[in-house]
Amino acid sequence: MSQLITKAALRVLLVCGRGNCNMFVSSVSSTSVMKSPYEITAPMRIHDWCGGFGDFKIGSKHVQGNFNLRWMGMSSASAMEKKDENLTVKKGQNGGGSVAVPSYWGIETAKMKITRKDGSDWPWNCFMPWETYQANLSIDLKKHHVPKNIADKVAYRIVKLLRIPTDIFFQRRYGCRAMMLETVAAVPGMVGGMLLHLKSIRKFEHSGGWIKALLEEAENERMHLMTMMELVKPKWYERLLVMLVQGIFFNSFFVCYVISPRLAHRVVGYLEEEAIHSYTEFLKDIDNGKIENVAAPAIAIDYWRLPKDATLKDVVTVIRADEAHHRDVNHFASDIRNQGKELREAAAPIGYH
C-alpha cells in the first residue's frame, strides 16, 4: 500500500516538473526576453517551485531531477547578457568612445563631428558654432533712463545702495568685481523667463517672445561669468560670498517680479548701467597698464567670434556691449509695463545673441 502511495506521489511530481514547469518557464522566459536580462531569474525560481530540483529524496526513494529547464533558462540569460555586451562594445567602437549603457532610448551619447571654419575640432559642449555671434560694438553706451516716477526712483536708489558694499569690498579689483557682477546679472533673466513661462501655461497665452529673450539674457550673462572664470580665480571667501549674494538676490528679485514686473525690469536696467560703468573703468585700467592685457581665453574667441590674437581688452569690450543691450531690453520692458500693457503685446527683441 505504501509503495502505491509513493509511486502516485512521484507521478504527480514528475508531471508537474515536466509539464507545468515547461509551460510556466517558456511563457515567462519569452516575456523576460522582451523586458530585461536581469529578470531571467524569475523562470528559474518558478522551475524550482514546481519540483525541478537536482537530486532529492522522497522517503527511501532517490529521484534524479531534470536540469533541462534550468539549463535552458541559464543559457538564454547568458546569451542575452552576451548580446548586450556585444551591443555595448559595438556602439563604443562606432561612437569613438566607450558607452556605459546601451542606447535603449535612442539617445546617441557620442559627440557629433563638429568643426570650426578652419577645420579644427569644436571643443565646447556648452554652446555650438551656430549659437555664437558678434557683439554690436556700435551700441550707444551713454544712454541713461532718468527716473520719472516713484517706481523709477525706488529702482535707482536700490541699485545705488547695492553699489556701496561692492565698491568697499572690491575697490578697483575689476576682475573680481566683474565675477561678482555676473553672478548677480545672470539671475534676473532666469527669474523673469521662468515666471513668464508659468504665466503662459497658466493662462494659455503666448509670451510675445519674451520668455526666449529673457532666458537668452540669462545664458549670455552666464557665459560672461564662465569667461571671467578663465581669467580670475576667486578665493574661498569670494566663492562663499557668491553663494550668499546669489541666494539673497534670487529670492528678493523673485518677490519683486511677482509684485511689480515694472519695478523689477527697471532695477535690472539700472544694474546694467552700473555694469557698463564698471567695464569702462576696467578698460581704463587696461589702457593705463594697471591690468595686464593678456591673451583672450579660447572660450571667448569662439563665443564672440573674435580674432585669434584677441586680448583681454577685446573681451571686456564685447561684454560691455552685451550689457548695453541688456540695459536697453530691460528699460524697454519696464516702459511697456509702465504704459499699463503686458509684455506680450510688444514683440520681444530676439536675435541679438
Swiss-Prot record:
Catalysis performed (reactions): 2 a ubiquinol + O2 = 2 a ubiquinone + 2 H2O
Residues that, per the record, bind Fe cation 2: E221, E272, E323, H326
Source taxon at top rank: Eukaryota
Gene Ontology terms, MF aspect: alternative oxidase activity; metal ion binding; superoxide-generating NADPH oxidase activity; ubiquinol:oxygen oxidoreductase activity
Induction: No effect of antimycin A, ethylene or cold treatments. Up-regulated by paraquat and cysteine treatments, but down-regulated by erythromycin, citrate, glucose and H(2)O(2) treatments.
Its membrane topology: Multi-pass membrane protein
Tissue expression pattern: Maximally expressed in dry seeds. Detected in roots, stems and leaves.
Binding residues annotated for Fe cation 1, in chain numbering: E182, E221, H224, E323
Subcellular location, record wording: Mitochondrion inner membrane
Enzyme class of the recorded protein, top EC level: oxidoreductase
Keyword set includes Flavoprotein: no
GO cellular component: chloroplast; mitochondrial inner membrane; mitochondrion
Gene3D superfamilies: Alternative oxidase (1.20.1260.140)
Keyword Transmembrane helix among UniProt keywords: yes
Its EC number(s): 1.10.3.11
Regions that span the bilayer: 178-198, 240-260
Key words of the record: Disulfide bond, Electron transport, Iron, Membrane, Metal-binding, Mitochondrion, Mitochondrion inner membrane, Oxidoreductase, Respiratory chain, Transit peptide, Transmembrane, Transmembrane helix, Transport
Cofactor(s) in the UniProt record: Fe cation
Assembly information from the UniProt record: Homodimer; disulfide-linked.
Record-linked PANTHER family: ALTERNATIVE OXIDASE (PTHR31803), UBIQUINOL OXIDASE 2, MITOCHONDRIAL (PTHR31803:SF6)
Family of the protein in this entry: Belongs to the alternative oxidase family.
Name of the protein described by the UniProt record: Ubiquinol oxidase 2, mitochondrial
The organism of origin for this protein: Arabidopsis thaliana (Mouse-ear cress)
